[in-house]
């Protein structure tokens, strides 16, 4: 199977929500590895669920930005494919530069450079949600990140942090329960 056919399968196979059309076109244009396409679909799929949950709590987010950010957060790995199967952070600034070169607005491109830096004081809720989706898609729980999200949501609602954290924990547990299926989906595709 050709790399292009594998990417098309990663973008189209049933099981996860489709990426936004502009992101799918971008990945095709970049001849992205199929594994990257599958990974971005998995993270985007979880991000949709998280955004729906946050909005359901009564908190507004920039839905377009969060979902675009989740769908492109690792796009820099087209230049650093070794980071698809190993550690590395070179893809983060590279992804932001790549998106900027392609004319993507800074408010959307920023997630590529910031998704691993959630512990910054100035991290926005939108940025935190992209990072959260990038953890939970594979069943990983990050207590400090979850506490920070709960604090921001609780502050917006005027509720106690513990009450929001309990509801968030329930939602993330539900999402983490689907991690095995998402991992299997991603791992069906070549790097």
Locations of regions flagged by a protein language model:
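Acidic/His-rich, divalent-metal-binding segments that scaffold phosphate/diphosphate chemistry
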Residues: 1-90, 141
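Generic structural signal of hydrophobic/aromatic residues within well-ordered alpha-helices
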Residues: 7-10, 23-27, 132, 145-153, ...
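Generic secondary-structure signature for well-ordered alpha-helical cores
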Residues: 32-35, 52, 154, 158, ...
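A generic structural signal for well-ordered alpha-helical segments enriched in polar/charged residues
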Residues: 49-52, 97, 174
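Charged phosphate-binding loop/patch that engages nucleotide di/tri-phosphates or the phosphate backbone
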Residues: 161-191
